Amino acid sequence: MADLEEQLSDEEKVRIAAKFIIHAPPGEFNEVFNDVRLLLNNDNLLREGAAHAFAQYNLDQFTPVKIEGYEDQVLITEHGDLGNGKFLDPKNRICFKFDHLRKEATDPRPYEAENAVESWRTSVETALRAYVKEHYPNGVCTVYGKKIDGQQTIIACIESHQFQAKNFWNGRWRSEWKFTITPSTTQVVGILKIQVHYYEDGNVQLVSHKDIQDSLTVSNEVQTAREFIKIVEAAENEYQTAISENYQTMSDTTFKALRRQLPVTRTKIDWNKILSYKIGKEMQNA
C-alpha cells in the first residue's frame, strides 16, 4: 500500500478522492468526505483539489437549502447556478452564496430574473407546489423561467429524500421537467431518478432513471400549468409503480434463483443444537 501511495501523484489522489465524493449515496456525503479525508491525509489538497466534486455532488443531487429569513427551501441545481458560488431562488427573487462543503446559504440579495416568462413560471410553480405537497412528504421544488436559444423555457425540479441512518438506509427521488412556451403545442421532456442505499445486512444500491417525452397543449398560463401537472403526475405514478413491481418480481424470482433462502433440507440449522445433528456427532467423534 505504501508503494502504491508513493507512485500516485497528488493530482491522481485528488482525482480518486473526487470520484468517491461525487458517487456518495444520498445523505452520506459527510461520511464519505471524512473517510476520503483520512485516506488522503492532506486537508489543503482535498479542499482545493476536490472543490469541484463538492459542487458537482450538490448540483447532481438537487440539494435543498434553507435561506435564513425565508420560509421555503430552494434546490441547488445547474439551472440556478449564477457562477462564483452564487445561486438563484426564483420564487423569492433573490440570489445567495452557497457553501458546497457546509451546505449553507448566506448573503441573500434581491435579484431580477427573466420578467418576460415570470407569469408562466409563477403559474407552473403554484401548481407544482400543490402537487409536491400532495405526493411527497418531504418534497421540495424549484421552478425556473429563462430564455434558452431564444426560446422562453420553463424548468421544474423536484427533490424528496428520506435519510434513515439509524435504520441503515437512505434514499432520494429527483425529477426534472422542461418545456418551451410555444403556440398550440409543445414538447415536455423529463427525467426521473431514484437512488436508494441499504446497508444493514449487506451493501445494496438501487440507482434508476427514466426519460419521459410527452406533448403539452399551450393555452393560457393557468390552464397550461394544470395540463403540465397532469403529465408529471401520470409519468411519476407510472414510474413509481413500475419500480415497485419490478423489484417485487426480482425478489420473487431473480434473488431466489441466485440463492436459496433455506438450505436444501428446507429447515434452518439450529446452531445451539449442532451436536444433535449427524455432522455434529461426526465432528465430536473425530
From Swiss-Prot:
Entries under Pfam families matching the protein: F-actin_cap_A
Phosphoserine modification, residue list: 9
Keywords: Acetylation, Actin capping, Actin-binding, Phosphoprotein
GO CC annotation terms, alphabetical: brush border; cortical cytoskeleton; F-actin capping protein complex; membrane
Stored SUPFAM superfamilies: Subunits of heterodimeric actin filament capping protein Capz
Top-level taxon of the source organism: Eukaryota
Gene3D superfamilies xrefs: F-actin capping protein, alpha subunit, F-actin capping protein, beta subunit
Matches recorded under PROSITE patterns: F_ACTIN_CAPPING_A_1, F_ACTIN_CAPPING_A_2
A Gene Ontology BP annotation from the UniProt entry: barbed-end actin filament capping
InterPro entries: CapZ_alpha, CapZ_alpha/beta, CapZ_alpha/beta_2, CapZ_alpha_1, F-actin_cap_asu_CS
MF (Gene Ontology): actin filament binding
N-acetylalanine carried by residues: 2
Family membership: Belongs to the F-actin-capping protein alpha subunit family.
Subunit structure: Component of the F-actin capping complex, composed of a heterodimer of an alpha and a beta subunit. Component of the WASH complex, composed of F-actin-capping protein subunit alpha (CAPZA1, CAPZA2 or CAPZA3), F-actin-capping protein subunit beta (CAPZB), WASHC1, WASHC2, WASHC3, WASHC4 and WASHC5. Interacts with RCSD1/CAPZIP.
Function: F-actin-capping proteins bind in a Ca(2+)-independent manner to the fast growing ends of actin filaments (barbed end) thereby blocking the exchange of subunits at these ends. Unlike other capping proteins (such as gelsolin and severin), these proteins do not sever actin filaments.
PANTHER family xref list: F-ACTIN-CAPPING PROTEIN SUBUNIT ALPHA, F-ACTIN-CAPPING PROTEIN SUBUNIT ALPHA-2
Official protein name in the record: F-actin-capping protein subunit alpha-2
Organism taxonomic ancestry: Eukaryota, Metazoa, Chordata, Craniata, Vertebrata
Gene name per UniProt: CAPZA2
